């Protein structure tokens, strides 16, 4: 009977009757990461969820995100702590009219299977709001973690507000085949820029040039970076979208034009390092070329969140934005997925399909 009716029906009946029945599974971090994250740093535990109050929804995760910030941020939490992260989840019971059953939300619920929250309340500081996914069929709802979610908005606002890229300018992107980088390159092409990417394999570079329309892409593991820049950016570089940091960023910033703009988005090249690497001094390039270098967190545009999502949705519908996903499977494989993404297994966005 239960199987025939489906989980949603069962959850609604129990929740309307006020009987708490749903048991959530969640990852708790017990040990700070050293080097790559390990399964033994975590424990999966179960908790029984309480009864829905007015305004609350119960969700069931369908896709969980693995993102580089997870490796970098956990040191800021007191242990043990619930693992942070975004997810796309289905609303399976609701006492909030704006968030009806059957719809999908993107939320910062962490690595857990089921969640109760009031999506109408403002998010905790540093977290993103819980948002209803627009109708994106025939595309998968997992795009709410990628081009139509946090990485998509990072690309949109980082490029438009920080780089302020203009038609005819040359932009260089590191981490170019990942979720943010591959998206930045496509928006920059749509603006009319020359786009040069650096990524970690020949296959990724071929994907960037042939599928996404990058003008040039180079394998940073095998290329001479200076020669690659001369070859790929004959008019030098106006904008640099920095996803990786380290020596490659110094080399690129030394190859920029006067008044170039650098969007410092992340520094994944050192996230797994306990001791931060030393790189060649950057100040001469910044001073003599009068560069504008600005770090940013995408949360800066939390009040304009929908603007970014809608702009990316428009590009998707116009056929100007392609996407690729590396899909891992199973709630038990979250750590493998996180490590795989940090090692560069993904082209495009890395996500985990929960079931
Ligand atoms: N500021 C913000 O608000 C914000 C928001 C989202 C993301 N970010 C940052 O943006 C960057 C990209 O994030 P994402 O979500 O799009 O991840 P991603 O690029 O989809 O995945 C991470 C990629 O990093 C690359 N990588 C790993 N080790 C590297 C190394 N030593 N040197 C160069 N590249 C390396 C790998 O690709 P390869 O095969 O090419 O090495 C891997 O696929 C990260 O630094 C992240 O922290 C910042």
Q: Residues of each region from the PLM?
A:
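N-terminal Rossmann-like NAD(P) cofactor-binding module of classical short-chain dehydrogenase/reductase
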Residues: 106, 172, 218, 238-241
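A short N-terminal beta-strand-loop micro-motif at the entrance of redox/enzyme domains
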Residues: 10, 14-18, 31-62, 78-82
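Short amphipathic alpha-helix with an adjacent loop that forms part of the alpha/beta core around
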Residues: 224-235
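NAD(P)H dinucleotide-binding glycine-rich loop of Rossmann-like/cofactor-binding domains
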Residues: 85-90, 101-175, 320
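Mid-domain Rossmann-like dinucleotide-binding core that forms the NAD(H)/NADP(H) cofactor-binding site
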Residues: 145-223
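C-terminal hydrophobic helical "lid"/dimerization subdomain
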Residues: 22, 302-355
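Glycine-rich phosphate-binding loop and adjacent beta-alpha segment
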Residues: 247-321, 355
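Glycine-rich beta-strand-centered segment in the early N-terminal region that forms part
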Residues: 48-66, 70-112
